[in-house]
C-alpha cells in the first residue's frame, strides 16, 4: 500500500473481499501528499447533542431512585486515552473484520473526550471509534506525537508560515473526518530557538480549529518544557504554563503526587484558568502512577477528584490486553464499576428522533437480524457451504447502557503471597536452565482477592478466576449475553430476584411532538417450549416521576422472541427502565418513537 498517496489503503480479509483500511500518517511527507491528492470522504456520524446537566455516578452506584441533576460545566471531566497494542488493529478496517473478540469500548456515558492514541506521527481515529463515540455524545481527538530522535519539528518550526501550514493541515484532517481536535504529545527535545514558534503553533492551531470545528479541543501533553527539554513535570508549573495558556487543556504525566496536584490547582487559579482544564494522567498499567493502576485505579482517581481536577484515563484496554479476550467482558465491567462513583453520566438528546437499541456492542460470534442468524456463503474445497459469520465493526455499535452492572463495586480487597516450588513451577522455569540449580528455589507471586455482592474474583498475574457466591442474591442485576441476539451481536440478560425493584437502563432526554409509543423485544429461555410468559413492565421517568406501563399488545415474533407494544401519554422522557417478575429475561431491543397512526385514537389506560 502506498500510504503517501492516501490515508486509505486496501487489505484482504478472510472472506477474500477487498476492503479499505484507515491508517495514520507516519511522516510529514505522507501527510502533505495525502492533502495534495485530496482526502477521501468517510461514513462519519455527527456528534449527538447532550443536555447541560449530568448525574453523579456515586448516586447511580448507590442505587438511588431519585437522581439529582447537576450542572455539567461545573463538574470535572473524564478523558479516555486509547492505547491498545499500538493501535490500528482490527479497528482500522472500514468494513470491519471477523475478529469478534477484539477490543471494544462501551462505557461512553461517563466519558467526555475520547483520544485515539498510537505511536505514529499523525494518528487519525478510525471511523468506527468516531461513530461509536459520536452516537453517545462524546468528543473524539486524534494524536500528534513525536518521540526519540525524531527531527520533524525542526522542519515544522522553521518559520511561522511553516507552522501555519502544518496547523492548517491538522485542522483540515479533523474537519474532513469530523472529529473534534488533537492531543499534542511531543516527546523529544526541541531546539531552544524554536520554542517561540512551538508556542505560536499551539496558539494558532487552537484559535483556528475553534473557528472551523464547533466545540473543538486542543490538549497539550506534559512532556517538553518551555526551554525545549524533554522533562515530564507531573504538575502544572512555570515550565509548561506557556503551552497550557494557549490551548484548551493539559494532560499531566502519571508520576504526580497529591501535593503536586494541589500546587497545580492553585497555579491554574492564579493564571485565571479553569482547574477542570487540567487532565491528570491515570495510567491503568500503573507505571509510576499512585495506587499502581489496575483494579486499584480508584486510589488515584479519588485523589484527583478531591482536588476538583479532570482525569485522563490512559490505556483502559488493560482489561483486554493483559488478561486476554476470554475474561474481557467481566473484567471490563468490574473495572469501570469501581471508577463509576467518581464519574458523571452525561445525557444525550433525542429531539423528534427515535431512540432504538439492540444493545449490540459492535461485535459478535454471529450477526442476527430480526432474531434470525445471518449466514455467509463460503467456498471449502470448491464446495459451497454456509456458516455463521462473526464480526467486529464499531460502526455497528448500538446505544449503550448509561449505568454500570449493579452491585459490582468491591466490598472487600485482600491479597496473599503464593510460594511455589521451583521444581514444580513449569510456568516459571519453562523447562529451561539447569534443573539441579532450580529445584531448591522458591518463587513467590501475589494473589489479589476482590469481593462484591455477587462474586469473589482472584487475580494472580494475568490469570483470573471468578467464583459466584454461594448465597442466593437478594438484588437485581444484569449482564451482557453474546450467545444470541435479536439484532446485531448480543442482548441484555436481566436477572431479577426482587420484583419490587426495577432495572434502570438508560438516562437520556427524549422529547417528541407526539405521544410516545415503545417496543420491547424479549425472551425468557424457560418459556421457549410453551406459551407461558411474563411480559416486562416498561418504566419511563420524567423529571423524577416514574411511570409503570403495561403492554398494550404482545405477540410472538418467532420461536424465541416476543414483542410488546406500549402506549403512553408522555412526550418527554429522561429515564428508561424495565420491571420483571422473578426470572432471567433477555432484552433484544428497545424502541421509543412517536405513536403509530393506527393507535392515535387509542385511550391509554395501562399506566400505573
Residue positions per predicted region:
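Short, surface-exposed beta-strand/strand-loop-strand elements in extracellular ectodomains
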Residues: 530-543
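Substrate-binding cleft of secreted/luminal carbohydrate-active enzymes
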Residues: 284-421
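N-terminal module-boundary/linker segments of secreted carbohydrate-active enzymes
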Residues: 2-89
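Extracellular carbohydrate recognition and processing domains
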Residues: 544-571
Amino acid at each position: 500500500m502506498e500510504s503517501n498517496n492516501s490515508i486509505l489503503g486496501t487489505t484482504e480479509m478472510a472472506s477474500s473481499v477487498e476492503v479499505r483500511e484507515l491508517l495514520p500518517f507516519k511522516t510529514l511527507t505522507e501527510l502533505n501528499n495525502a492533502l495534495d491528492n485530496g482526502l477521501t470522504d468517510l461514513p462519519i456520524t455527527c456528534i449527538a447533542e447532550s443536555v447541560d446537566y449530568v448525574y453523579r455516578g456515586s448516586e447511580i452506584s448507590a442505587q438511588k431512585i431519585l437522581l439529582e441533576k447537576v450542572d455539567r460545566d461545573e463538574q470535572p471531566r473524564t478523558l479516555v486515552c486509547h492505547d491498545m497494542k499500538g493501535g490500528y488493529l482490527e479497528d482500522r478496517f472500514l468494513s470491519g473484520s471477523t475478529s469478534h473478540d477484539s477490543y471494544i469500548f462501551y462505557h461512553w456515558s461517563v466519558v467526555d473526550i475520547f483520544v485515539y492514541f498510537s505511536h505514529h506521527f499523525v494518528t487519525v481515529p478510525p471511523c468506527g471509534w468516531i461513530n461509536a463515540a459520536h452516537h453517545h455524545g462524546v468528543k473524539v481527538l486524534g494524536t500528534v506525537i513525536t518521540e526519540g530522535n525524531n527531527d520533524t519539528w525542526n522542519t515544522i518550526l522553521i518559520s511561522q508560515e511553516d507552522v501555519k501550514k502544518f496547523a492548517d493541515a491538522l485542522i483540515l484532517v479533523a474537519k474532513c473526518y469530523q472529529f473534534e481536535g488533537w492531543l499534542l504529545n511531543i516527546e523529544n527535545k526541541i531546539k531552544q530557538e524554536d520554542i517561540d514558534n512551538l508556542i505560536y503553533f499551539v496558539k494558532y492551531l487552537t484559535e483556528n480549529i475553534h473557528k472551523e470545528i464547533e466545540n473543538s479541543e486542543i490538549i497539550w501533553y506534559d512532556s517538553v518544557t518551555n526551554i525545549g527539554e524533554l522533562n515530564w513535570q507531573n504538575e502544572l508549573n512555570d515550565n509548561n504554563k506557556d503551552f497550557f495558556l494557549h490551548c484548551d487543556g493539559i494532560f499531566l504525566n502519571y508520576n504526580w503526587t497529591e501535593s503536586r496536584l494541589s500546587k497545580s490547582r492553585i497555579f491554574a487559579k492564579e493564571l485565571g484558568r479553569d482547574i477542570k482544564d487540567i487532565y491528570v494522567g491515570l495510567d491503568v498499567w500503573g507505571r509510576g502512577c499512585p495506587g499502581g493502576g489496575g483494579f486499584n485505579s480508584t486510589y488515584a482517581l479519588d485523589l484527583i477528584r478531591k482536588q476538583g481536577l479532570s482525569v485522563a484515563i490512559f490505556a483502559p484496554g488493560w482489561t483486554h490486553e493483559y488478561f486476554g479476550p476470554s475474561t474481557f467482558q467481566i473484567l471490563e465491567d468490574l473495572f469501570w464499576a469501581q471508577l463509576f462513583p467518581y464519574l458523571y453520566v452525561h445525557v444525550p438528546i433525542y429531539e423528534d428522533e427515535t431512540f432504538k437499541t439492540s444493545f449490540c456492542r459492535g461485535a459478535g460470534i454471529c450477526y442476527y437480524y430480526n432474531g434470525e442468524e445471518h449466514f455467509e456463503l463460503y467456498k471449502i474445497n470448491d464446495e459451497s457451504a454456509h456458516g455463521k459469520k462473526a464480526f467486529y465493526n464499531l460502526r455497528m455499535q448500538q446505544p449503550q447502557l448509561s449505568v454500570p452492572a449493579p452491585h459490582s463495586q468491591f466490598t472487600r480487597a485482600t491479597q496473599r503471597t503464593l510460594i511455589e516450588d521451583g521444581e514444580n513451577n513449569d510456568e516459571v522455569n519453562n523447562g529451561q536452565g539447569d534443573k539441579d540449580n532450580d529445584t531448591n528455589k522458591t518463587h513467590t507471586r501475589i494473589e489479589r482477592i476482590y469481593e462484591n455482592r455477587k462474586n469473589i474474583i482472584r487475580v494472580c498475574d494475568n490469570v483470573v478466576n471468578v467464583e459466584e457466591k454461594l448465597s442466593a442474591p437478594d438484588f437485581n442485576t444484569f449482564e451482557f449475553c453474546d450467545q444470541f441476539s435479536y439484532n446485531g451481536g448480543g442482548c441484555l440478560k436481566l436477572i431479577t430476584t426482587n420484583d419490587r425493584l426495577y432495572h434502570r437502563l438508560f438516562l437520556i432526554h427524549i422529547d417528541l411532538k407526539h405521544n410516545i409509543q415503545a417496543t420491547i423485544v424479549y425472551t425468557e429461555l424457560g418459556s421457549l417450549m410453551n406459551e407461558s410468559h411474563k411480559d416486562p413492565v416498561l418504566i419511563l421517568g420524567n423529571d423524577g416521576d416514574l411511570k409503570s406501563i403495561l403492554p398494550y399488545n404482545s405477540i410472538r415474533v418467532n420461536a424465541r422472541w416476543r414483542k410488546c407494544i406500549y402506549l403512553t401519554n408522555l412526550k418527554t422522557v429522561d429515564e428508561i427502565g424495565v420491571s420483571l417478575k422473578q426470572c432471567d429475561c433477555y432484552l433484544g431491543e428497545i424502541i421509543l418513537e412517536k405513536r403509530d397512526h393506527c393507535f392515535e385514537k387509542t385511550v391509554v389506560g395501562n399506566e400505573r
